[in-house]
Amino acid sequence: MQCDVCIIGGGLVGCSTALHLVRAGKSVVLVERDRIGAHASGANFGGVRRHGRNVLELPLSTRAFDIWRNMGTLVGNDCEFMPTGHLKIARSEAEMAVLEQWSSFGAEHGIPVVLHDRTSLRANFPWLNTSSFGASFCPGDGHANPRLAAPAFALRAGAEGAVVIQGDGATTVEDARDEFEVTLHSRRRIRAAVLVNAAGAWGRHFARYYGDEAPVEAVAPQMFVSEPVPYIIDAVLGMVTGGLYLRQIPRGNVIFGGGRGILDPNCHRSSPSDRVFAETVGLAGDLVPSLRDIAVIRSWTGVEGHCEDGLPILGPSPRRANLYHAFGFSGHGFQMAPAVGAVLSELIARGFSETDISALSPRRFTGAKSSILAESEI
Amino acid sequence: MRAAETLLRAGLSAALIDEAPLAGGQIYRQPPESLRRPARQLYGSEARKALALHESFSRLRTSIDYRPETLVWGAREKRLLLSGPAGNTELAFDKVILATGAMDRIVPVPGWTLPGVYSLGGAQVVLKGQACLIGKRPVFIGTGPLLYLVAYQYCKAGAEPAAIVDTSDFTAQIGALPRLLSQPATLLRGIWYNAALVARRVPVFRSAKPQKIEIRGRQLVVTFKRNGKSFEIGGDAVGMGWGLKPETQLAEILGCAFSFHAGSRWHLPRCDAMGRSSTEHVYIAGDASGIRGADAAEAAGELAAFAVLEDLGHTVPQTRRQRLLAHLARAERFRSGLERAFPYQVPELAGDTVLCRCENVTVEEVRAAISSWQISELNQLKALTRCGMGRCQGRLCGSAAMEVLAAETGVEISDVGSIRGQIPLKPLIGARFQRKAAP
Ligand SMILES: Cc1cc2nc3c(=O)[nH]c(=O)nc-3n(C[C@H](O)[C@H](O)[C@H](O)COP(=O)(O)OP(=O)(O)OC[C@H]3O[C@@H](n4cnc5c(N)ncnc54)[C@H](O)[C@@H]3O)c2cc1C
């Protein structure tokens, strides 16, 4: 099979890249080993927030915010995006100081937030516990349904001409003159001028083919869902410490996450840890006391690539022309993926993008150690 | 209970964990003290067996770590996670025997979610455990031996069933006779129930195709077709069930390998004749690895205990072992006969039938999603439609959802997958994990 661009990985990053590229007139083959969205993109919390992000991600995150608001027009499915606003909780004065500091970064990037002290928290978010010190609220952020997003992008991309292959992974990548030759598990081969490595937690493997090293390891954040109860939690919750994140959907289920589950030895799959179960369910009941009386019906995990500095590996390979990396999203990729596709397709089709992703470049691991602060929360 | 008894006799220390407040399982379930009735009345022809089991268990009670009202909500490696009167605890083990039994298999019929409609198993639970009836004039729909057994038990308890609506046909039941003769006593019991129902003039309709259940005035009316004609039967309650399906979630969590079983159209954990699963320290006995009924379950429990003992280097009585194996082999043959006599057939489901009652997803919605999203696998179906995503996590709708998916896509039923199990195995209240008191 011959195409302009071959994308390895059918998570939201790969699917969004596929859609943007076909719209830019490129012929695209997307290769997914399992099913579209089967990994991090389908299993994640569904948080769509700019609030509290590392400033180096903000250009990308802000662009993604605009896409999320128009998701229905872009892919024909709003993916249940709800701009409820995001509330980040501080449990101490020191944590509040972190929020205050971020509020000025936010202002610089055009993301205004509202700071709440204990009293105004009580008045505005009566379902919250009474022991929180304060919080910062970011209107416009919100949540969406991760089970729909990647399949919606893939379906759209397929309808507009991309070839979407599922259940058949890439096993090797080789050079064939100036092109790439990707061999699949089924022995099918794909020739492409450009290769996008969107293999999520497994992206490091393909990066290494061309000597690109990135300190990305697989982790398995753990999620929970409760039985449906009346809808009262009308904002996405997060904590400065990152230990817990929580949202409720209008159907009534409360979805929350915190802690990490257990990875299989081969890092392909993961499963929930019962210790984390006990801890996180306990934390959720501390934060929203009414959750103590309701039942948790399921816990699950997803395999995510976590980079040492908490930032994705995104941009052209420093070593091989026409190779682009987009993996290791470190818990932030669901929100940013729609913009990742837009930026990559601009870089591939036009050679430049107005969105500044230079701080996320794989180049940062070629030599000098970076001094970027980690922000590990989802 | 039989497994526990065998292990204790060999000098092993054992714990018995049961979700129910009193021992006996589904079939020999005991009512609470205040609702005691004579065994003969509760268990009918099986009273002797029930009493024998209860007695042998009460002798055991002091020597076993018995934990009633305790749910196993998960497991990892050699630890079980328990939730019970003692709160949430863990139990470390060397070997575990899963005797988790089975639950009703339901074919959704429009109206099956109405108040007054119960599963056959549920109808039996309220009768045995709570001394209640689902109604004085219930209509029983479905197929399988339980259909007739429950109707019979309801008669004995003073109800007058309005009708039995069986979706299988009589010729299939005759055709299965040779296999059913492998357990003549059980077959006889079945014939006896039938005869008793005939004697009480309970109308039995075979080869019926249920169309809908409706509330009319104070009645529940069941409409079905038979030989092209439409019938209506009114009653004050409906019990429905299409045989049983094994409860296999714990085996799945413990990493046991499964294979598709064509007769029951369901994925079953792979076991050897003694009950050894593919996971070294996990054994499975009774209906949990395939529906063979109560007598076989007693044999299987003892055999699984023998397997544990053998694997721990004990010697087990060989003649007894052979006898039990032969008993199970007969039960297996009987089961294949039952599967022929009462084949599990999913009829063409009407579009407006609610398929997933927890999430209120209709057959029509599922069909539309299958075609618009190009769905070919059950977990994908769940992710995109919410079918199987609710409180019961697909226990109730999983089997019918598989059928709809296979029928829509033309994919073999064996290849559409099954809903992946996760912890907690059943809904678990958050308060159980609270460390601090409420502020
Ligand atoms: C539990 C959890 C909660 C999260 N919560 C949030 C959140 O609230 N907000 C947020 O913004 N982000 C969140 N994230 C992060 C977000 O989900 C990820 O960053 C994002 O989905 C990454 O998308 P991806 O396409 O890079 O990865 P993935 O979705 O993992 O996709 C990578 C794909 O590559 C495929 N692949 C790998 N190797 C091969 C191969 N050899 N051949 C073919 N295909 C291959 C895999 O099968 C996989 O489908 C969370 C992550 C998890 C796990």
Question: Predicted regions span which residues?
Answer:
Chain B
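Residues forming the flavin
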Residues: 1-385, 389-391, 395-439
